[in-house]
Structures are given as C-alpha cells and as structure tokens.
C-alpha cells in the first residue's frame, strides 16, 4: 500500500493489559518527583531546588537515551547470540509497533515505554550523588554515557531472553540488580570522585525540610506499588501478590528502622521512619513477585536492621554518600535478591500462569543461592569499574569537571548552578542584610504611623511589628561577622 492511501491497524490486543501497563508506566514515572522531594528535603536549604532540578533532568536524559538506542541495546530480540548486550535493530524505536511475541497480548511499544520509566527511576536515584557539591551539566553527560555502558548491558543480562542471567535462572522480579544495586554503586562511586563536602559546612547538619522528606517517601511508596505489581505485565494474581508483598516489606522495614533509632536517641525519628520504609520497598523490588507473604515480613525486618547499620560504611571508607544511596538502595537490593534464594516459591512465581521456576530453598532449590550471589557480584563489580572509568575520563575533559568550586559550594548550588531558589523569602532576607536599611528613616516612618494609631490601632500594631523586626535584623547584622563578610564579598 502506498503512503497516503490510508492505513488501518489490524493488530488486536487485550485492552485491560494495555491499560494496566500504561497506568503502571505513569505511576513509575510519578516516583521521579517523589525522589526529587525526598532528596530536596534531606539536603540543606541552599541546595534544595538543585536536587529537584537534577532529578527531573536525569529523567529527560534517560528518555532521550532510551528512544535513540537504549531500548535496543537492552531488549533487542535479534541479538540472541550475544549474552552481554543487544544490538541497534530497534534504534529510534524502529520495529516496536507489533506484538513483542506471537502470544503476547500487548504491543511492544508499551513494553518499551514501561521499561523506559524504570531506567528513568534508576538515573534519578543516581542524581542524588550530586548533593550540594556536584556540577549539573557534567552529571547529565555522565548519566547519558552511564545509561549506555552500564544500565543497558546489565538490564540485558537479566531481562532480555538472550542475557546470561536470564538464561541462568536468576530471580530478579523488578530490578534489584539492574536498578537498585546499580544506582547505589554508581552513586557511591560518583560520590567518591566528587570528594567530601567541606567539614566546616557540615557542623550541626540536618535535613532542612522533614515534611518534604515525608511527602517524597509517600509518593515513592504509592508509585512503588505499581513499580512492582505491574512488572507482571498483566493484571493477574502474581501482580496482586507482588502488591501485598511490597506493602508488608515496607511496613516492617519502617517499623524496624524507627525502633533502632529510638533505642539510641530515645526519640521517634520521622527521617528514620522514611528511611526504613524505603529500605523495605527496595528489598521488595527483586522479591515481591517471587517470595511468600511471611517471607516479606521477615525481609523488611532484616532490611531495616542491616541497612541501618550499613549507613556506617561510608564513614569507614571516607566517602561522602550524603543521601545514603549505598545503604538504602544497594544493601537493601542485596537483601531482596538473597531472600529470593531463601523464600522464593515455585507456586508464587507461577501465579502469572506462564512462568516456570523451581524457586529457592523454600522449595528445595538449593543452587539458587550461588546463582543469586554470582549475579549480585557481577552487577556490582561491573557497575563499579565502568562507573569509575567514566568519572575519571570526564574529570579530565575541560568543561565537564564534576565538582563545583569551594566558593560555589559555600554559596549553594541553587544560586551557583540554578539562579533560582526553593524559598524566595530566604533570599530576600539575605539581600536585606547585604543592601542595608536606613534605620533612622524607618524610625521616623514608624513614629509618624504611631501618631495615627488612635484612629487605626490595627495598622499601629503592624507598623510596630515591622519596626521591631527591622531593628532586630539590623542588630543581628551588626553583631554577625559572617554577614559583614557576605556583604563585602
């Protein structure tokens, strides 16, 4: 048929499956702003907006990379003789408009979109490594190269029919290796190359907005439910089971971390609660479609304990992993993959009606443990080495040095890299100190207003408050050497 004659699509698909996957892709994407709010709240105020920006921009980079050659490298159907990486047969989303296989009930295009959102989440997690000291443009260059050389090969290993891990029988339901461990190791290595933040700037450091941390965690949990459930690729019993497993693991993970923090601080920590929930969600990522419900209860407890203590690793290795990517994503991902070897059951895996697997130790498949461990080691090792090479090479190229200057770090990434601020009133207050205010003129204005107070007592009260605030601010300015220094600068 010639072009322009009118073409009617004759392929038929199951509408419920297509709708399920579209909804799943949308909710996985919704995790991206959740990560942005989480990271922003955990950082200091002067870099709050930069972390939201870098997470969103990481998603844009990921979408472009996936469209050009990412999907083809990760899921090529014609690279059956290559167990490491796909080819460019689907470059630019070519040949992805039919069924992904003869017996599939959905078009390959929706599968490509769904997997694209998974990579966007992985890149957004890594973006947190730039916290308070990383340049933004070089990080975007890093993410594009990283997605090509690291994410696509490891994803091909585990999810493409030609990958060695897929053929070996590794159990990784929704990305414990190619998303969680990969993003954690990459973020940790990137933090190493960035170097530590200035110690004098970390005195009395604490998250600037715990409410935003809580909001981000809630959004993540909401999106994570379909992140795991929709990995069944159809609305079946296995997706329902994965949904419940995700909730159980997050619940016990949050409770466990919170109790551990209370044991040492004798206070209930909201940040600790959110950290534990995230650890439980991460652990459920590779296991929620494979293990039993009571296994998820135990998994959340183990993840909460192990990840809580794993936050100390960065101090021993002297790496400024400011957002604890290694502990909360890497170690939790390892826990989930190990639990697949322990608690995976053949009857859980078979709930989708199509997948056959012997399960783990629970169903007497003893060799599953070394298969899982080998996959963990291969994913983490390959990611660490290639990420280090990418960071080293980029650091030698003029214009793409990874770290900002000391002055920019002290000023904050919002002002140095963005030019906008998460909280304008903070910058108005700073400008007030730098510009200075004529207090004599303000006193004259306020005294004139006082003479009219008999006719308008409300206005008198407001002017008095303004006068007090102004004088107080001037006194603070005159007694604070840091503000004098800022004005001179």
Swiss-Prot record:
It is a multi-pass membrane protein. GO terms for biological process: ammonium transmembrane transport; nitrogen utilization. InterPro entries: Ammonium/urea_transptr, Ammonium_transpt, Ammonium_transpt_CS, NH4_transpt_AmtB-like_dom. Signal peptide: none annotated. GO terms for cellular component: endoplasmic reticulum; plasma membrane. Residues 448-489 are annotated as: Disordered. Residues 39-48, 130-139, 195-209, 261-267, 311-330, 394-489 are cytoplasmic. Residues 1-17, 70-108, 161-173, 231-239, 289, 352-372 are extracellular. Gene3D superfamilies: Ammonium transporter AmtB like domains (1.10.3430.10). The chain crosses the membrane at residues 18-38, 49-69, 109-129, 140-160, 174-194, 210-230, 240-260, 268-288, 290-310, 331-351, 373-393. Residues 448-481 have a biased composition (Polar residues). It is found in: Membrane. Keywords: Ammonia transport, Membrane, Transmembrane, Transmembrane helix, Transport. GO terms for molecular function: ammonium channel activity. Transporter for ammonium (both charged and uncharged NH3 and NH4) to use as a nitrogen source. The affinity of MEP2 is about twenty times higher than that of MEP1. MEP3 has the lowest affinity. Present with 3820 molecules/cell in log phase SD medium. Belongs to the ammonia transporter channel (TC 1.A.11.2) family. This is Ammonium transporter MEP3. The lineage of its organism: Eukaryota, Fungi, Dikarya, Ascomycota, Saccharomycotina.
């Amino acid at each position: 048929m010639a072009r322009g004659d009118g073409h009617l699509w004759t392929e038929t698909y199951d509408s419920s499956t297509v709708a399920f996957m579209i909804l799943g892709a949308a909710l996985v994407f919704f995790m991206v702003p959740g990560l942005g709010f989480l990271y922003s709240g955990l950082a200091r105020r002067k870099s709050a907006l930069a972390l939201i920006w870098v997470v969103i921009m990481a998603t844009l980079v990921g979408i472009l990379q996936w469209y050009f050659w990412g999907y083809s490298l990760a899921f090529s159907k014609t690279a059956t003789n290559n167990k490491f990486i796909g080819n460019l047969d689907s470059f630019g989303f070519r040949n992805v408009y039919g069924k992904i296989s003869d017996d599939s009930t959905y078009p390959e295009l929706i599968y490509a979109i769904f997997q694209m959102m998974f990579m966007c989440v992985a890149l957004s997690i890594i973006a947190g490594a730039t916290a308070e000291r990383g340049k933004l443009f070089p990080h975007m260059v890093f993410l594009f190269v990283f997605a090509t050389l690291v994410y696509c090969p490891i994803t091909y290993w585990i999810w493409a029919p030609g990958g060695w891990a897929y053929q070996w029988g590794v159990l990784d339901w929704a990305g414990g290796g190619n998303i969680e461990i990969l993003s954690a190791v990459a973020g940790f290595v990137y933090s190493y190359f960035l170097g530590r933040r200035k110690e004098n700037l970390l005195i009395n450091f604490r998250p600037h907005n715990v409410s935003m941390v809580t909001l981000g965690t809630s959004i993540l949990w909401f999106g994570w439910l379909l992140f795991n459930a929709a990995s069944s690729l159809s609305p079946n019993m296995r997706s329902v089971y994965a949904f419940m497993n995700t909730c159980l693991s997050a619940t016990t993970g949050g409770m466990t971390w919170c109790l551990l923090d209370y044991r040492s601080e004798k206070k209930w920590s909201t940040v600790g609660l959110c950290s534990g929930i995230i650890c439980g969600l991460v652990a459920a990522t590779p296991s929620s479609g494979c293990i039993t419900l009571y296994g998820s209860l135990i998994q959340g407890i183990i993840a909460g304990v192990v990840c809580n203590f794993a936050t100390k690793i960065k101090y021993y290795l002297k790496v400024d992993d400011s957002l604890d990517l290694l502990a909360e994503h890497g170690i939790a991902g390892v826990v989930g993959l190990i639990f697949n070897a322990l608690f995976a059951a053949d009857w859980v895996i078979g709930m989708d009606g199509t997948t056959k697997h012997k399960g783990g130790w629970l169903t007497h498949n003893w060799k599953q443990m070394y298969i899982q461990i080998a996959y963990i080691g291969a994913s983490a090792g390959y990611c660490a080495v290639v990420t280090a090479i990418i960071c080293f090479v980029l650091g030698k190229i003029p214009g793409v040095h990874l770290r900002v200057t000391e002055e920019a770090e002290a000023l904050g990434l919002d002002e140095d890299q963005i030019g906008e601020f998460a909280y304008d009133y903070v910058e108005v207050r700073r400008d007030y100190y730098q510009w200075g205010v004529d207090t004599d003129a303000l006193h004259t204005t306020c005294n004139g207003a006082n003479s009219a107070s008999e006719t308008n007592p409300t206005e008198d009260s407001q002017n008095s408050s303004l006068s007090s605030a102004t004088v107080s601010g001037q006194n603070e300015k005159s007694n604070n050497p840091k503000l004098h220094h800022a004005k001179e600068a």
